[in-house]
Design a protein with these regions (language model features):
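Residue-level signal for inorganic ion chemistry
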Residues: 28, 72, 99, 177, ...
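An anion-binding catalytic pocket shared by soluble metabolic enzymes
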Residues: 50, 55-58
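AMP-dependent adenylate-forming
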Residues: 32, 52, 143-144
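ATP-dependent adenylate-handling active sites, centered on carboxylate activation for C-N bond formation
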Residues: 5-15, 86, 125-131, 136-142, ...
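Conserved glycosyltransferase catalytic-site signature
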Residues: 95-96, 115-117, 277
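N-terminal segments that mediate ammonia production and transfer
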Residues: 2, 7, 15-20, 26, ...
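Glycine-centered helix-coil hinge/cap
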Residues: 85, 104-108
Length: 314
């Protein structure tokens, strides 16, 4: 949760923002952090994936002039760190800290350098400006809004803004908002978005296979245990098979060291006897994952719908 262009008392706003963040604490139960000054407030609820020990947010630069709150993962953070190791002093092992380094070097012109899924808010205290951005296709959710005092808000879930903002919008994927420009700008554009540009493209199966493997492999970056949700369908089966292929080694060391959790765990959820569960078990047996089947009854499913609806509103 973030608030910018503050016009109300910062300490009163701080309490309000903490209550807003509490509404979405289920998104990040591992750490709660807040930054507050007279112009901006950033509150973060963290789910630890990379660098659980020192990656608490909001992240700050060494001079504490740049403050960053990120929801997401930056898959090419090791490459960026290596490129900038002589230009920026990193304080944590967090994959997201590279955003601070890139901003310090390039200003707002760095979004194309990032390979990942993300929604972030970066406040530049020295220049009293801020940058909000969202990943190319909107994997990570983000909303924005304004209250009656024209204060600008962002949040990972709509319910954090409900009752506070009198105007709320979805922050569009592939866009950024820079406070000095005061309008949304599209930063992600590709020629293949127009059919005319790709209608005659030949498909290279080997190239497609390599791209898919690389996409799955880079997302195995983790300092905590992970698993795959396996339905037995084509998509989840292919992704699970690729994940199993690389699960025994640590991606972070370019497969040079053994993974901390070398066995891939797969999970399937459904009604007992459902055909999806049977298919998932067949795939799990074939690829050799440690498989977990979780069953629920129709009544349990109906009961869960009420609980989920209430959680969305709370």
């Amino acid at each position: 949760v973030g608030v910018f262009d503050l016009s109300e008392d910062p300490q009163q706003m701080r309490g309000k923002v903490l209550k807003m963040a509490k509404k979405i604490r289920h998104r990040g139960p591992d750490w709660s952090g807040i930054y507050c000054n007279n112009k901006a407030i950033l509150a973060h609820e963290r789910l630890s994936i990379v660098d659980p020990e020192s990656g608490g947010q909001p992240l700050k630069s060494k001079d504490e002039k740049l403050i960053l709150s990120v929801n997401g993962e930056i898959y090419n953070h090791r490459e960026i760190r290596n490129e900038m190791k002589n230009e920026y002093e990193f304080l944590t092992g967090s994959d997201c800290e590279v955003i601070l380094a890139l901003y310090k070097k390039k200003g707002i012109n760095f979004l194309e350098d990032i390979n990942g899924i993300f929604a972030f808010a970066l406040y530049d205290e020295e220049n009293d400006c801020y940058l909000i951005a969202r990943d190319p296709i909107g994997v990570i959710p983000l909303y924005m809004g304004w209250d009656s005092s024209k204060q600008f808000y962002i949040a990972s879930e709509l319910k954090a803004l409900e009752g506070i903002c009198n105007h709320i919008e979805i922050f569009p994927p592939g866009h950024y908002w820079y406070s000095k420009e005061r309008q949304l700008q599209k930063w992600y554009t590709r020629d293949w978005e127009k059919y005319e540009n790709i209608k005659n493209n030949a498909v290279d199966i080997n190239e497609l296979h390599e791209a898919l493997e690389n996409a799955v492999k880079r997302q195995l970056m983790s300092d905590v245990p992970y698993g795959v949700l396996l339905s037995g369908g084509l998509d989840s089966s292919i992704i699970s098979a690729i994940a199993k292929k690389y699960a025994s080694k640590r991606i972070e060391t370019d497969n040079k060291s053994d993974a901390w959790w070398p066995q891939l765990h797969s999970f399937a959820i459904g009604l007992k006897g459902a055909p999806d569960l049977k298919a998932a078990k067949e795939v799990a047996d074939y690829i050799g994952s440690v498989h977990h089947e979780i069953n629920y009854t129709i009544q349990e499913g109906l009961d869960a719908m009420l609980y989920i609806t209430l959680k969305l509103m709370m």
